[in-house]
Amino acid sequence: VDNKAICLKLLAAESEAAVQAIIDSVPEMSDPANWDAIDERESNFNVVTNQASTGGKAATELMTNMVDAILMRRAFEQGIDPKDRSQAPPNMYKAVDRLIVNLRGGKLVNAEEAWLKDFASKNLIVGITGSRETTRKSKEWPCYTFVDNGEGQHPADFKNTFLSLSARNKSDIPFVQGKYNMGSSGVLSYCGARWFKLIISRRFDATGPWGWTLMRLRPGGGLPVADYFHLAGEIPAIDADALYPLHKNTGERFDGVMLKTGTVVKLYDFRVGEKFKSFRGAREAFNENLTETILPFRIMDFRWSPDKKRGGLRAHGIDARPFYGMEYALRRREDEREEDEDDDEEQAPAGATVAEKFEVGVIDDPTLGKIEITALPMRARADGKDPLPGWLKHTSSNSRVFHAVNGQVQYKQTRGYLSNCGFSGIKDRVAIIIDASQLDEGTHYKLWKGDRENILQNDTGERYLTIVKEIIVQSPSLDDWKQQIAREDLKRIATEDTNDLFQKLVDSDRELIALLDQRDPTLKLPDPKDDDEEFEGKFDPTFFTLGKRFESEPLELPLNKARAFTATTDAVNDFFIRADNQGRLFVSDEKVRARFAIKHILYDGHLTVFFSPADDTIQAGDFFEFELGLVSDSMSRPLTEPVSIKILAEEE
């Protein structure tokens, strides 16, 4: 059997039917003896299908694995043992700074556009080929090819990596995300009726050949089983100096993407979602499931007709776009006008002014770990059109609150949730990101369900959701944004003076009624802050002043309540959430950190720090004294004040 010829034919195939034709034409592939259950489990159906609930979510699992592969390769190349915590980066963001390029906190928003494009085009590509049908009625689906220039695998290692459902290969590696070892198989049930998925890989050091295998749903009736192809128990191997994994819609090889090592995964007739068949739709599906990609991607759609007038890739029928995730799309509008078929509506609409993200609050809980909550506001457009990008409009998505780990969305909450928190007026003017990346490792396993889309309804899940909601409800920054939007809406009512507009706005935000003067039918607008009064903080604070009541008396804290210290400071609003030289809350006594859940909110020079007992050994009458303040790596010393807490009996 000519392994190389078969592999290249499969790579060039652009439909499930074409793959089946290849199988039927090759005696070795038609022989059931050369197919075995993935992970040697005849019951692997339960694992394969009990993962992502949509094709878009499943695809982003693959993209996460691609980023892991790049970081792993760079670690190996620099002589770093990924499992040695004394030398390996402690998280993905620090891994980007140390192993790839210093982005001052590992954030893509700090990178130059030229570097982002160059890195993505050489390392992380998603190609869309095959069917050009984009209507919901069509039964045809495109193919997706995922190409990464990462660590790759030897053929002999496929069974313990790509073909494993249970081996925790990355569980001891602190700077990768794909620790569940299931993300690669989660796409199978979205690959047409036969679950065809091709994997080709070569180890990054080129010390061995390429290996390849094809996965499929076992033909015949009975319990569904996911199989993989082998030859006499061995993964087929081929020799090739370079691999060109993508083809133009004419069938010609595309020379613009080439691998000498790394991994290619091709999904045939991939069902990303009924409304996501178009190129824009694919990017929208990815955006909603990745708040950030950690490393830059390039997505290329090969299904266009060649347009010689436009030149570049469009002359070859290819539309290529950068993809960096939700946060980047909302904060920085990327333009590739020479390649656009239309406006980039998955990003902020043209004419929209997108504000920098702001802090909602930070939680440091000894039983859970650290949680950072930020908001991405969307300001009004000068032309009066909807400021929401298309993929966030409620006709496409109701999701507004995104719980993420290393950029990968684990759980979503809706517009209704924001209304329930008292923010109905901004439910279509903000996206909130709950960054749970710094939760304790044990918390992750107690919090997220195996599908990584839901939260377990146990003590950990209930505690997590409760403290997150408390921070959102208490957020002065969200309240200020709500007031700004209310002023905009009331101004529109007063200016346009139409009953229809008034009714529409009040229907969407019942809180507007409270802002109207009931004694006078004339609308009165709340006075905005004068420009001279706008708060301008400092990168590093120069003062931290405790509220006067705490200068001479302790914070009295019931065992079953949370109570807060208040302070004033000149720290800038993003002191705790910025990527570059992130500030920290200073607590002098580590025993206090270990025994109390601490939540803090900083906004316009006002800092509120909530303490609540989290240790069962704390008793009424206990007394704690320590220093509380602010610190960052660029400050010569922390700014602190002495504080004390007196524990009281539980309150009714």
Question: How should each PLM-predicted stretch be described?
Answer:
Residues 40-51, 144, 173, 261-274, ...:
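Short hinge/gating elements
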Residues 1-132, 136-139, 156-163, 506, ...:
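Bergerat-fold GHKL ATPase/HATPase_c domain
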Residues 148:
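Acidic ATP/Mg2+-coordinating residue in the GHKL
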Residues 74-87, 175-180, 298-305, 481-489:
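Short, glycine/acidic-rich hinge or "gate" loops at secondary-structure transitions
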Residues 152-154:
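A short glycine-centered beta->alpha linker in the GHKL/HATPase_c
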Residues 85-120, 214-248, 324, 329-354:
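Charged, glycine/proline-rich intrinsically disordered loops and linkers
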Residues 1-26, 274, 333-652:
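Charged regulatory segments coupled to nucleotide-binding catalytic modules in large multidomain enzymes
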Residues 143, 160, 170-323, 652:
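GHKL-type ATPase core
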